[in-house]
């Protein structure tokens, strides 16, 4: 008989032990290194922060990034459990992952999802917005993924705009199932990560709506291929493999051939006027 042991209680943040350690010494392969701050959750070193003095113009956040790259090379086992890396010199505060380039370390510009004052990411906004206990656990569980074809996967941390927008969209979806079925509009500027927001959204829908079937419909074949490819790269995170419908008949078969789950990609051209709906099921999200 086997038992499941959960290393982190995501439902109740207060049931976990959070320890912030300054200058934790780690020795590996003769290398003695002391990262500035490590956040341990239940004994796991999940967040590493490298800090630089704001009073020294020649040393800033970029130097903190380079220091983390050296840690990854010198004490690699420190990063076996790492989820988030932070670089900060008080004026610049950014978060990324072990595969993020410097340009992919991002600011966190809001404490609570209020977008009225996000021009600059202040020190307190970054830390209070991202590292509230319950929110940090939510990020660890639902907003970090690996994307790749198995050769060299990329570890991706959601941006603050993705986090709050997806969370709001999930709540709207819950309301929609009990009202008119309309979930609303999720608007993104170009290049701000809308396809990854869709992946995070699909991941959370599985739990929020009790494993619905998700149909992703676009108006262009190239966009259908692009989104399908992105979702396929994130299949382990989604815990299922997406499929593309090849025809209207195939789409109908894919919908009626299951009672739950499934992520199906199709174009609007596969739909036409008809007397019968493609499916009578209620647990389908388009």
Language-model segments: which ranges?
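ATP-dependent helicase/translocase motor core
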Residues: 1-213, 222, 226-238, 259-263
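Signature of the SF2 helicase/ATPase Hel1-core->accessory helical subdomain module
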Residues: 61, 106, 272-286
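Short, hydrophobic beta-strand segments that form beta-sheet elements in well-ordered domains
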Residues: 85-86, 243-244, 286
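Hydrophobic positions in the central parallel beta-sheet of the AAA+
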Residues: 216, 264-266, 286
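Conserved helicase motor
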Residues: 221, 242-252, 267-273
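Conserved motor-coupling elements within RecA-like helicase/translocase cores
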Residues: 246-264, 276-281
